[in-house]
């Protein structure tokens, strides 16, 4: 690598809104705040909700007179 053209790589702390603290390295050079992390994200905690779009599909099919495949 050429000297003097690359940004400085520093250790920073990423703090989540749930209180989880993650130490990492970045060229940003300052600590950051996160909205979600692996400890509080619904996908990783198992609290994910499935959105049912069946009503919208049925409405579309009835609007365009497409027979149901069920």
From Swiss-Prot:
Keywords: Metal-binding, Ribonucleoprotein, Ribosomal protein, RNA-binding, rRNA-binding, Zinc
Cofactor note: Binds 1 zinc ion per subunit.
Cofactor(s) the record lists: Zn(2+)
One GO cellular component, as annotated: ribosome
Binding-site residues for Zn(2+), renumbered to this chain: 16, 18, 37, 40
Gene Ontology molecular function, alphabetical: metal ion binding; rRNA binding; structural constituent of ribosome
GO biological processes: translation
Top-level taxonomic group: Bacteria
Gene3D superfamilies: Ribosomal protein L31
Function according to Swiss-Prot or TrEMBL: Binds the 23S rRNA.
Family (UniProt): Belongs to the bacterial ribosomal protein bL31 family. Type A subfamily.
Name of the protein in question: Large ribosomal subunit protein bL31
